[in-house]
Design a protein with these regions (language model features):
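Short, low-complexity, Lys/Arg-enriched N-terminal segments of secretory-pathway carbohydrate enzymes
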Residues: 1-69, 100
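Catalytic cores of eukaryotic secretory-pathway lumenal/extracellular enzymes that build
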Residues: 145-496, 502
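N-terminal signal-anchor transmembrane helix specifying type II single-pass membrane topology
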Residues: 51, 56-110
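Amphipathic alpha-helical repeat scaffolds
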Residues: 569-577
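N-terminal, immediately post-signal peptide pro-regions of secreted/luminal proteins
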Residues: 93-144
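Amphipathic, non-membrane alpha-helical rod segments
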Residues: 578-603
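Non-catalytic, C-terminal membrane-associated alpha-helical segments of glycosyltransferases
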Residues: 480-562
């Protein structure tokens, strides 16, 4: 067939018992005919499944009759009232619980009313769309399949997606979810059978473990019915899909991906269109539909038993509606028992970052992993990690992944973290790990998993231009950087207004102009940051830490000096006074590791004396 196919997929839950995945491929270049492949994957609640594929020429639609318009309008009215009645009398499997999530204050659940309003809104929008676009009367009785190239009208089922054309990629993507009109977004709590729902987002590039990650989450959750898996799958023909069970559901309907198939949503992209994890996660955030909590993980993780109850309990312990639990996950090796329980008492904490390369971009380094200094609650930290992020669902809506950062890998962590802080969110290291990561460095079977930069889309992208956009949006651009960065939707993907970004850089000891950052681990890992900011300045209503008063004046460098640099400088002085070469060698090693001279240039003469004692030249 001529031309390259345009590809857009949507997974739609048509009813509580069935899930439908629509895969649409359209080839341009036909004057009167478009060829459309429509793939429907039906998953029944009993675990059975059926796949239907059709390929047929489709005549270009020229119009619809006035009679059809009248019928559609009447149908829209019937659907709206039917939706209202259904959600009023529906079984409690998808209705709001009368028992809200106990947060800083009690928030009512408005799930049933919200869904009724949403059903009426969708039907009204469909009717309005038909009225607006109705052409002159023409007899056309053939049902038309979804066309990925033609302009798209409203197309949404009760738990499905409204799709729109992405201006940057040309792909059909889900529209962003918006909170119900008149409802406080921070108070919105979605629930299933009284349990708050969890949106689990996985971005996967040709990763055969994506399905194992999803299955692990569903199998080991205490309340699996509340978990909604949203996978952005970037595959080539023959690759294992994120929703593909190891064996057909007809042979084993009890597999997690069969038993809970209606809760697994897959957005399928051609791997050739991939430009890195940022865009994939951007699409993943578009799949969010108002769930109470949002969890973002990589496609090669293993969950522990009861992870859903455990992580929500940890989040509640912060007493902070704006808490985001995030860290670099511990390696899987030696972390999970055969029965699915955690074997670890340690956890990593995000505190070590510095500028790398030229002109210098802030990157996270290796993070310390120890038994928490404060054991009964997640500990406050300055930074955010993409491989594990757990927060209330409004985080996904308010701090959206940027649409326009192709070829950026890891750099988006600084962007999301800084933007989130300016939107009022606070980062915490989890109290205990509820899942673990299989790193390629320790797993031979992962060393041959393809990387996104092999794709044609990645080769066409400009990573340096993306980094200019990323740093400019968070006011971290180098002073002499060219001003030709992409300003597409800069206000949507820029900073928040709850806190000034300059205050974040001040408290995190990040000097943007000098391209330097002080290591914060002595301040963070000791629990000082948590005690000085969380304990002292958490708002009474639990909606974030208050940085408008005394917290703004906190002298973090004084704490770092006391815990880190003062002991090193004292050790250097003792070495010089005693003429102890071994002590000088150890002190110089610490001075180099912590960049003592860079952050305290007044100590350079002392460091030089220690070097002369050691017999080494200054590097």
């Amino acid at each position: 067939m001529p031309g390259k196919p345009y590809h857009g997929d949507v997974c739609v839950n048509e009813c509580p018992n069935y899930g439908i995945m629509l895969s649409v491929f359209s080839w341009p270049g036909h004057s009167q005919t478009r060829h459309t492949s429509l793939t429907a994957v039906l998953g029944h609640k009993d675990g059975t499944s059926m796949v239907q594929n059709t390929m047929r020429p489709r005549q270009r639609r020229r119009g619809s009759s006035a009679a059809q318009f009248v019928r559609l309008s009447a149908l829209a009215l019937i659907v709206s009232w039917t939706g209202l009645l259904f959600f009023v009398w529906a079984t409690p499997s998808r209705r709001a619980s009368a028992e809200p999530v106990p947060l800083a204050s009690e928030f009512p659940l408005r799930d049933a009313a919200r869904r009724a309003r949403e059903a009426a809104r969708i039907a009204a929008a469909a009717s309005a769309e038909q009225r607006q676009s109705a052409p002159s009367a023409k007899h056309d009785t053939e049902a038309q399949p979804l066309d990925a190239v033609a302009p798209l009208a409203v197309h949404q089922e009760r738990d499905g997606f409204t799709m729109e054309r992405d201006e940057q990629t040309g792909l059909l993507v889900p529209t962003f979810w918006e909170p119900p009109v008149g409802v406080d977004e921070l108070a919105h709590v979605d629930a299933v059978n009284g349990e708050p729902t969890i949106f689990l987002m996985i971005a996967s590039y040709r990763d055969w473990q994506c399905r194992d990650t999803a299955a692990s989450a569903l199998a080991r959750a205490t309340h699996p019915r509340r978990v909604v898996v949203a996978a952005v799958q970037q595959n080539r023909p023959g690759d294992v899909g994120c929703a593909d069970p190891p064996v057909p559901c007809s042979e084993d309907p009890h597999q997690p991906l069969c038993k809970y198939s209606s809760q697994v949503r897959v957005y399928a992209m051609d791997a050739n269109d991939a430009t890195g994890p940022v865009y994939a996660r951007h699409v993943g955030y578009r799949m969010y539909r108002g769930e109470a909590f949002a969890l973002q993980v990589d496609a090669h993780c293993v969950f522990v038993n009861g992870w859903d109850v455990g992580i929500i309990d940890q989040w509640k312990r912060t007493r902070n509606e704006m808490a985001v639990l995030s860290t670099y996950l511990t390696d899987l090796e030696g972390s999970v028992s055969p029965s699915g329980d955690s074997l670890r008492k340690t956890r990593p904490i995000m505190c070590n970052s510095d500028f790398e390369g030229s002109p210098g971009y802030l990157r996270h380094g290796a993070q310390p992993e120890r038994v928490p200094a404060i054991r009964d609650v997640p500990m406050l930290q300055p930074y955010w990690a993409a491989g594990f992020s757990f927060a209330r669902g409004h985080f996904v809506h308010r701090v959206r992944y940027d649409c326009c950062l192709p070829m950026v890998f890891m750099g988006e962590e600084i962007s999301i973290g800084v933007r989130a802080w300016t939107h009022g969110y606070d980062m915490y290291a989890p109290q205990a790990s509820v899942l673990f990561h299989e790193y390629a460095q320790k797993s031979s079977r992962r060393r041959h998993v393809p990387k996104f930069w092999e794709s044609k889309g990645a080769r066409r992208a400009n990573g340096q231009k993306s980094l200019r956009r990323l740093t400019s949006l968070i006011k971290m651009a180098p002073p002499d950087m060219p001003d030709d960065w992409d300003r597409t939707k800069a206000s949507l993907y820029g900073l928040g207004t709850d806190r000034p970004v300059d205050l974040f850089y001040k408290l995190a000891l990040v000097d943007v102009s000098r391209r330097s950052a002080v290591p914060l681990c002595q301040f963070v890992d000791s629990g000082d940051m948590h005690r000085m900011l969380h304990d002292a300045h958490l708002r009474a209503d639990g909606r974030g830490i208050d940085y408008t008063g005394a917290a703004r004046q906190l002298d973090v460098m004084k704490v770092i000096d006391k815990r880190l640099y003062d002991p090193i400088s004292n050790q250097l002085r003792r070495a010089v006074e005693r003429g102890d070469k071994n002590l000088a060698r150890n002190a110089l090693s610490e001075a180099q590791r912590t960049k003592l001279e860079k952050h305290h240039p007044e100590l350079r003469e002392l460091v030089d004396e220690a070097r002369r004692l050691k017999g080494a030249q200054r590097s």
